[in-house]
């Protein structure tokens, strides 16, 4: 698939996931095995809630956040349209980029890794054939890099570029837990929690999330450079006229 802004799908493809016999893999394996299992005794109540809260279509959360920011900053209709377009164009290219990486590396999900750990050649990882992720069903695509992390890093990068980094109270509503709202003071705080949620949900290794965050930021940075904004100075004369005339 041809990207919208990127020159090619693998432009920012991350390095391969950690080797199965590495110390890094051992650490991330044991982390998700402990924190991400259904009915975990190691995860806190808040970590379990976070894992469930974000277990929906991550782009939808970030569009809600953008709506809050647009209203708080009193953008004109034209400026608001540009903000949403920039955000979702970034998401579109990030989806292309992370699927390119996922199907290049075809790295296993925690549920498969943990159940069949006896085959990984690492004597520091113990198999649990009955292990289930906290969030229930595992996504059908490969694990590395993490989609939530990629999208959230891109969303935070774009919105920080558009609105700046000043504190902004953000209420985010769960896509999957009706009526449950969590509050944040910055785009970066949202990004961090959304990324960590996939570990608590038992869906991803931390290495997936780290790679996703780097990929998402790189794609967003490229998009911003290609389609710069002028929102801070409110000097979009056409947008200001459009807002006043209507």
How would you label these PLM feature ranges?
Residues 1-235:
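Acidic/polar surface patches and capping/hinge elements
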Residues 234-246:
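Glycine- and aromatic-enriched low-complexity segments, predominantly in secreted/extracellular proteins
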């Amino acid at each position: 698939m041809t990207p919208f802004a990127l020159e090619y799908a693998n432009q920012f493809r991350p390095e391969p996931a950690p080797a199965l016999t590495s110390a890094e893999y051992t650490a991330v394996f044991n982390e998700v095995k402990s924190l991400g299992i259904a009915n975990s005794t190691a995860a806190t109540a808040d970590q379990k809630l976070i894992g469930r809260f974000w277990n929906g279509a991550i782009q939808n959360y970030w569009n809600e956040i953008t709506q809050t920011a647009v209203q708080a900053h009193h953008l004109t209709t034209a400026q608001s349209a540009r903000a949403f377009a920039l955000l979702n164009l970034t998401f579109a290219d990030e989806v292309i980029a992370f699927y390119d990486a996922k199907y290049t590396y075809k790295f296993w999900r925690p549920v498969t890794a943990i159940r069949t750990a006896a085959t990984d050649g690492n004597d520091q990882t113990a198999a649990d054939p009955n292990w289930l992720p906290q969030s229930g069903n595992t996504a059908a695509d490969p694990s590395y890099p993490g989609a939530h992390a990629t999208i959230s890093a891109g969303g935070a990068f774009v919105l920080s570029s558009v609105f700046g980094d000043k504190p902004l109270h953000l209420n985010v509503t769960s896509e999957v837990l009706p009526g449950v709202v969590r509050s944040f003071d910055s785009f970066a705080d949202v990004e961090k929690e959304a990324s960590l949620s996939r570990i608590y949900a038992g869906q991803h290794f931390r290495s997936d999330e780290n790679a996703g965050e780097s990929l998402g930021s790189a794609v967003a940075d490229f998009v911003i450079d290609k389609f710069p904004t002028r929102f801070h100075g409110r000097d979009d004369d056409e947008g200001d006229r459009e807002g006043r005339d209507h």
